[in-house]
Structures are given as C-alpha cells and as structure tokens.
C-alpha cells in the first residue's frame, strides 16, 4: 500500500470546481485500490501575489506525514500546486494561470498601459517558473485533454501525454428524457451561457425549456437577459445545487448543453454521458469536442445562436434521437475507467 498526496490549489471560499471534484474522485479511486490517499490544498493568491503562492507551495514539506511515515508520491493538478517538491511527482495538469497564457489578450485588453507593463513582467516570471517546474521538477506530466496538451506545447514547448479524467464515482442514472435541456456550469463569460439565451429567443427553439445550474459572476447579467428576451417562463436558474440535485437533473433532462469556449476539459461532458444523455457543444469549445462526436453521441455546432437554436430544437423535438446519442455516450464513457487512470498516474 502506497501513501499518495493529491495536491491542487483552490481559491478561498470558492465553491467546488472541476479540478477539486477530479482530485477527490482520484483520492476515492486510490483508496478503493488499496492505497492511502488524501487531498492537499495549496493557496491560489489574488493578482499581484501569485509569486508568494508559488513560493509557499515550493516550501511545503510533503516528504512525510504526521506519523513519520514517508509520503510515497505526489500527484498535482493546477497552478501553483505543481510547485510542490517531491522525488516522485506526477502532474495531471488541467491548466496553468490562463490569464497569462491563452487568455492574455482578453485579460490585458482592458488594462492601462502601466498595469499592462506590470502584468507583462509578472507574466514572464510565471512563464519561466512554470517551465522550470514542469520540465525539471516533475517526474511525469499528463494533460487532462488534448486542448491542454496543445497549450503546453505552444507556450513553453512542454510535452505531455493525454489522460482524460473519467466521470467521478457517483450514482449516475437515466430516469427519462425529460422536457428540458440542462446547462450545468459556472456562470462566467468564458462559459458562454448567454449564447443559450440568444438561441432560445429564435423561432426554431421557441418551444425549448432550459434549466441552468450553477453560479458565478455573470448570474445577474444572465437573469437580466432572460427578462429582456422574455424567457422567464422557459428558463429556470437553479443556482448552486448539491451533488444529489445535480444527479437528479442529469437523470431527468433531455440533454446537456455546454457551449463553452476554449474549455480545458469540461467534466460535465462525461457526467452527461454517464447519465446516458447527449451533449450539445460548439466547434471552438476545446475539451468537450474531444469527447463529443457530432451526430453520434451529441451535436457539435458552430458557436452562433442560430446553429444552437436548431440543435436545441432537434434534441427537444426528437426524444429517440436524444436517447440514441445518450446510449452512444454511455458506451464511450464506460471505457474510461479509474483503474486505467490510476495505473498510469502511479509511479510507486
């Protein structure tokens, strides 16, 4: 039996993100396969103090536990958790600090010249630190998607094998193909939930109902759009829900819509498949497009309101189509096992 520390950063008072769900799922899998495992959370400081978060993580001692026994291996996730020092260190990365990588143009656009200059310096330092840590201080790097793998290669010329996370070990089920499409996501601009609302107001999708699960900075704006578009009778904002409530929605929705842009992975995709539900996503959605095969287990459409409206209408009007896609998705995700993931991640 090995003793494994699963390490990830997490913002203070933030609700559980996908990285934390995957970390906890990995711990559960490790324990089921006879190992001793725990999640270790490292700081993720606000802008201007990222260096301190990297340093404090670098100085954290994970060499041995309270009882004097050694920690045999570390498996880290997102920045700056991979700054942990350990002789047996695998990084299963879901992302670096995206504001300094693929999201730099969007992030820096609104900054003053003075702030942009300061952030350029920080960006260069973070790039250098990330490359050193992932190239020289980690035994093995796995990317959670081909999208992440491509970013590592583009910014830093870092190589990584791809290992998609399986669905978390939850009691998924399919009760029916109900009368609404489910959106389960943080409500932030990159998730592009407004595209769903814009699609629902178009003629093809004017009979489609939608339940939106999740919370975030865009919530008030999205609620305002819903009222502006006259969609109050067809769109329900369920807010942050428990795991039980999420599984209930997955079991009873017609399909899952995830129109995100440049997503790292998109855990809801495999959770939908595990619930025998189709997924609608967009051609530029990143991670989900690696799993959703157009016209086989879901629909991959252009990121326009018109295309999404047509896709929503097709799924909503044809329960047999939704079911056939869902069955194909379940078949695909069944092959993604935690046994395989653990076998690849373990060095000891």
Task: Give, region by region, the residue ranges found by the protein language model.
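Conserved donor-binding/catalytic core segment of Leloir-type glycosyltransferases
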Residues: 173-202, 211
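Short hydrophobic beta-strand element within catalytic cores of glycosyltransferases
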Residues: 278-282
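Conserved acidic donor-binding segment of nucleotide-sugar-dependent glycosyltransferases
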Residues: 283, 293-306, 314-319
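Membrane-proximal helix-turn-helix segments that form the acceptor-binding/catalytic region
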Residues: 110-141, 149
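Nucleotide-activated donor-binding/catalytic signature segment of Leloir-type glycosyltransferases, i.e.
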Residues: 223-241
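Short alpha-helical donor nucleotide-sugar binding micro-motif in glycosyltransferases
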Residues: 240-241, 248-253
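A short, well-ordered alpha-helix in the C-terminal region of glycosyltransferases
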Residues: 314, 321-335, 347
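Aromatic "clamp/platform" in nucleotide-sugar-dependent glycosyltransferases that forms part
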Residues: 261
């Amino acid at each position: 039996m090995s003793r494994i520390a699963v390490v990830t950063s997490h913002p203070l008072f933030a609700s559980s993100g996908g990285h934390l769900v995957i970390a906890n799922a990995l711990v559960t899998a490790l324990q089921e396969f006879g190992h001793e495992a725990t999640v270790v959370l490292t700081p993720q400081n606000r802008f201007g103090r990222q260096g301190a978060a990297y340093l404090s993580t670098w100085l954290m001692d994970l060499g041995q536990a309270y009882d004097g026994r050694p920690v045999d291996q570390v498996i880290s996730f997102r920045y700056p958790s991979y700054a942990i020092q350990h002789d047996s260190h695998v990084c299963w990365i879901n992302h670096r600090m995206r504001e300094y990588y693929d999201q730099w143009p969007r992030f820096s656009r609104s900054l003053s010249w003075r702030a942009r200059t300061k952030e350029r310096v920080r960006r260069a330092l973070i790039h250098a630190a990330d490359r050193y840590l992932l190239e020289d201080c980690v035994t093995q790097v796995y990317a959670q998607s081909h999208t992440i793998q491509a970013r590592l290669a583009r910014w830093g010329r870092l190589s990584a094998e791809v290992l998609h996370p399986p669905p978390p070990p939850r009691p998924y089920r399919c009760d029916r193909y109900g009368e609404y499409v489910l959106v389960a996501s943080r409500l932030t601009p990159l998730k592009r939930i407004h595209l769903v609302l814009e699609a629902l107001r178009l003629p093809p999708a004017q009979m489609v109902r939608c339940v939106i699960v999740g919370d975030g900075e865009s919530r008030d704006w999205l609620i305002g759009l819903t009222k502006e578009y006259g969609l109050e009778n067809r769109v329900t904002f369920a807010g942050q829900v428990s795991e039980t409530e999420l599984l209930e929605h997955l079991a009873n929705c017609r399909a899952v819509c995830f129109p995100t842009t440049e997503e790292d992975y998109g855990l809801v995709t495999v959770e939908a498949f595990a619930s025998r539900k189709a997924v609608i996503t967009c051609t530029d959605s990143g991670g989900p497009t690696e799993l959703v095969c157009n016209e086989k287990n879901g629909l991959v459409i252009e990121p326009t309101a018109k295309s999404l409206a047509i896709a929503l209408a097709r799924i909503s009007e044809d329960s047999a189509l939704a079911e056939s896609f869902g069955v194909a998705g379940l078949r695909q995700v069944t092959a993604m096992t935690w046994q395989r993931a653990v076998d690849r991640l373990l060095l000891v």
